[in-house]
Design a protein with these regions (language model features):
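Low-complexity, polar/charged sequence tracts that form flexible coils or short amphipathic helices
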Residues: 148, 187-191, 205-209, 249-252, ...
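Hydrophobic helical h-region of N-terminal Sec-dependent signal peptides
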Residues: 13-17
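Bacterial N-terminal signal peptides that target proteins for export
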Residues: 3-12
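Solvent-exposed adhesion/ligand-recognition segments of exported proteins
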Residues: 5, 18-275, 282
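Conserved small/polar residues in nucleotide/adenosyl-binding loops
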Residues: 354-361
């Protein structure tokens, strides 16, 4: 009798095939945080919370840590930037300070993934000790689905590779590929002053909450010296959209800025609200908008601007639209000036403003 003819044998064989097939799909999730070398040490604490003793800061105050895997589960993770022990806000007891600091805490913690695995962030990442900025850099992509940050003034999620000057300071990020995906549980960046997403593309399935939110999209060299964004050659095909907002996605922040540089790559934005200051949206392609509200000014520029029917686009002060074609189908309101710079304007929605300053060559009302 064939050994595989028995039902139990066939079942075991299929189970073995299944496990062999699916295991490679989740290496990053299983791996947690794995340092690439001995400069960074990772220890697991009770409650499945990894504590990372970060690498010795360089002369510029940067602790540059490299990993095979950098994933944060729902219990969270801790970056130890303390010179003394204590208890973290996540409830983890740390007996001793991080000896790698040599008495001098880092001013910026860079966590760079050098393998081929994406990063999955599903919990809160805490800086223990001196408050400092945190960067997670993974060219393969980053998924944030319920991630948050504790004791850090600035958070950067990037698919770029960090570039350093001769003094060891962060010079730029070079982005050639990779997407940041915000899952249904969102990104809570409200505890930081600044949240930056620097990637070739971003997908919003959940909400980003922040004080000051900046998205820089496309294949770019992003300077940390003067803030300039210079397009460079990307790897692989262009994304269909630089930013794509799904049904439950959105951005909520005190101030919002978006720059998308790849020619012909569009942006789909909905549920975008600034609670304190302005919103600035700039793209080299088509930008489609629905339910956008700026507490002060709203500035939008692109090759083509389309506002969707059944939605609202609103500025509590001035609203500026600059494109080759502006196609307004929404309820569009400016409590101050409305400025329109376009070759063609189509309006099948409603428009309300205090003053209109239009500069177009052709208009369809």
């Amino acid at each position: 009798m064939d050994k595989l003819a028995h039902p139990l044998a066939r079942g075991a064989s299929w189970l073995l095939i299944y496990l062999t097939a699916v295991q490679p799909l989740h290496p990053a999730i299983a791996a947690g945080i794995t340092a690439a070398n001995g400069n960074t040490q990772v220890a697991m604490k009770p409650g499945n919370v990894p504590v990372v003793n970060i690498a010795t800061p360089n002369a510029a105050g940067i602790s540059h840590n490299t990993y095979q895997d950098f994933n944060v589960g729902t219990p969270g993770a801790v970056l130890n930037n303390a010179t003394q022990g204590g208890k973290t806000q996540l409830g983890v007891t740390i007996d001793n300070g991080n000896a790698r600091l040599k008495g001098k805490p880092a001013e910026l913690i860079i966590n760079e993934v050098t393998s081929g695995n994406r990063s999955e962030l599903k919990g809160r990442l805490e800086v223990f000790g001196n408050k400092t900025g945190v960067m997670i850099a993974n060219p393969n992509g980053i998924t944030c689905d319920g991630c948050g940050f504790i004791n850090t003034p600035s958070v950067t999620l990037t698919t770029g590779k960090p570039q350093f000057d001769k003094q060891g300071a962060l010079d730029a990020l070079e982005v050639k590929k990779g997407a940041v995906i915000i899952g249904g549980n969102g990104l809570d960046g409200a505890g930081a002053e600044y949240v930056d997403v620097i990637s070739r593309a971003t997908e919003l399935n959940g909400k980003i909450n922040a004080k000051t939110l900046t998205l820089t999209q496309g294949a770019n060299r992003v300077s940390f010296k003067d803030g300039t964004v210079k397009p460079i050659a990307g790897e692989g095909a262009k994304p269909q959209l630089a930013v794509d907002t799904k049904a439950l996605g959105g951005m909520y922040a005190g101030k919002i800025r978006l720059v998308a540089t790849e020619a012909g790559v569009g942006v789909n934005l909905s549920n975008v609200t600034s609670t304190q200051r302005d919103i600035s949206l700039t793209t080299a392609g088509k930008i489609t908008l629905s339910n956008v509200k700026a507490q002060t000014d709203l500035n939008i520029s692109g090759r083509e601007i389309v506002t969707l029917a059944g939605s609202s686009v609103r500025a509590e002060r001035d609203l500026t639209l600059a494109a080759t074609t502006v196609d307004n189908r929404s309820s569009t309101t400016a409590h101050g000036d409305m400025r329109v710079f376009a070759s063609t304007v189509r309006n099948t929605g409603t428009v309300s403003y205090t003053h209109l300053r239009a500069h177009e060559t052709r208009r369809h009302l």
